[in-house]
């Protein structure tokens, strides 16, 4: 994230009771960059609680998600936010490439469709990758994820689309998803 060509970002890291050295690493990075914030959850609560906690603490206009094992390309925020602003879009996603567990690209890519509504993603649930989404929270007022074990992001996209929004795809690989 720190390598983004778009510099007006804040990174809210939610530590969901990790057992590695995440907290120490983040605290070191915070000393180098004031845009990094750390929130430690008291108990392991899962992805939905972590994402919702991050959204509650976010101050910016745009919300994006990145899990610890995935990666954004350095131009992701700049290109996708420009795409949103030039077209007045409130919900966007991009194409992404697949990495194996070691971080090697597999040659597989999930291509973004031009646009998707509620019925489109019901037919193709894997259309929108969470790591590629950017939401305009000034126009999408309830982006919070239901506290369910799996597919909480998919349930959220359905809710947003059911409320009349359309998701627009940018067919450029801007992220890497780790299997």
Segments the model singles out, each with a brief description of its role:
Residues 1-8:
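Short, acidic, metal-binding catalytic loop of nucleotide-sugar glycosyltransferases
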Residues 15-24, 43, 67:
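A conserved acidic beta->alpha catalytic loop
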Residues 20-28, 71, 75:
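Acidic helix N-cap motif at the loop->helix transition within catalytic regions
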Residues 41-58, 79:
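Glycine-rich, basic loop-to-helix element that forms the pyrophosphate-binding segment
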Residues 56, 94, 112-179:
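Conserved nucleotide-sugar donor-binding catalytic segment
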Residues 63:
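Short aromatic/hydrophobic "clamp" motif used to bind/position activated sugar donors
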Residues 67-71, 95:
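The conserved acidic donor/metal-binding loop of glycosyltransferases
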Residues 75-106:
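Conserved donor NDP-sugar-binding/catalytic core segment of glycosyltransferases
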């Amino acid at each position: 994230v720190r390598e983004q060509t778009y510099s007006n970002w804040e990174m809210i890291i939610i530590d969901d009771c990790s057992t590695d050295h995440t907290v120490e690493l983040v605290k070191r990075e915070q000393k180098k960059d004031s845009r990094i914030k750390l929130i430690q959850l008291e108990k392991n609560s899962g992805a939905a609680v972590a994402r919702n906690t991050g959204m509650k603490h976010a101050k910016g206009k745009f919300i994006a998600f990145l899990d610890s094992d995935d990666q954004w390309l350095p131009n992701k925020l700049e290109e996708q936010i420009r795409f949103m602003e030039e077209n007045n879009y409130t919900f966007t996603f991009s194409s992404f490439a697949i990495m194996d567990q070691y971080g090697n690209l597999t040659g597989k890519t999930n291509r973004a469709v031009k646009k998707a509504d509620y019925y489109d993603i019901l037919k193709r649930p894997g259309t929108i990758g969470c790591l590629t989404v950017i939401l305009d929270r000034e126009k999408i007022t309830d982006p919070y994820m239901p506290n369910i074990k799996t597919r909480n992001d998919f349930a959220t996209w359905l809710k947003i689309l059911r409320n009349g929004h359309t998701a627009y795809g940018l067919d450029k690989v801007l992220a890497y998803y780790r299997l």
